[in-house]
Amino acid sequence: MKIAVIGAMEEEVTILRSKLEQTNREVIANCEFTSGFYEGKEVVLLKSGIGKVNAAMSTTILLDRFKPDVVINTGSAGGFHHSLNVGDIVISTEVRHHDVDVTAFDYEYGQVPNLPAAYKADNALIQAAEDEASELGHIQVVKGTIATGDSFMSDPDRVAFIRGKFEDLYAVEMEAAAVAQVSYQFNTPFVVIRALSDIAGKESEISFDQFLEQAAKHSTDLVLRMIKRIN
């Protein structure tokens, strides 16, 4: 079993990288791939860069060259659901684009033509995350829809617009739908694990700077537990 873990930023991958043994580092198209082992499991860690194009390009390289059996996308996100607070973790049930609009041709809002409107996370990976979440103690862990777009959600008007498009949205960020779309095309199971660094629209940029490290630690803690469980 080879497990791929993808984070966009250095803060989102640094803890996991430090835990890997027998590592080998490669840089391909300015994307950093670190292969190694954690608790006897083979892991490929990708630092993808920020945004959907970087995520799609690097995930394609990852799946084509390294051929992992499963993909876990980790890192930070902005909270959308009223029940969430900074530091909470969202496990994806499905992932959607929030900045794609081809509704003029009868596609759903967020749907790329000829592809699913929503990319469903793998049930076994969701279950592994849920099983390990109970060991995290005081951290609230929920599961739900995560949406992706190439914008940081600090504008209240934009937040209200996106809320109007998706009934039950838990978190937003800038890479997961690209990772999910490429994983779907390669028929590779995936799940997204994101901890909240901010609440969308509420001084998000200030909160992000303050709480990115905490969010990265929370999401990495769960991912490390998952790696030990996945067979």
Swiss-Prot record:
GO annotations of cellular component type: cytosol
UniProt-listed Enzyme Commission number(s): 3.2.2.9
InterPro entries the record matches: MTA_SAH_Nsdase, Nucleoside_phosphorylase_d, Nucleoside_phosphorylase_sf
Tagged with keyword Zinc-finger: no
Metabolic or biological pathway: Amino-acid biosynthesis; L-methionine biosynthesis via salvage pathway; S-methyl-5-thio-alpha-D-ribose 1-phosphate from S-methyl-5'-thioadenosine (hydrolase route): step 1/2
Active site location: E12, D198
Database matches in Pfam families: PNP_UDP_1 (PF01048)
Cysteine-cysteine disulfides: none
Alphabetical UniProt keywords: Amino-acid biosynthesis, Hydrolase, Methionine biosynthesis
Molecular function terms, GO-annotated: adenosylhomocysteine nucleosidase activity; methylthioadenosine nucleosidase activity
Positions bound to substrate: G78, M153, M174, E175
Function: Catalyzes the irreversible cleavage of the glycosidic bond in both 5'-methylthioadenosine (MTA) and S-adenosylhomocysteine (SAH/AdoHcy) to adenine and the corresponding thioribose, 5'-methylthioribose and S-ribosylhomocysteine, respectively. Also cleaves 5'-deoxyadenosine, a toxic by-product of radical S-adenosylmethionine (SAM) enzymes, into 5-deoxyribose and adenine.
Protein name as it appears in the record: 5'-methylthioadenosine/S-adenosylhomocysteine nucleosidase
Encoding gene, per UniProt annotation: mtnN
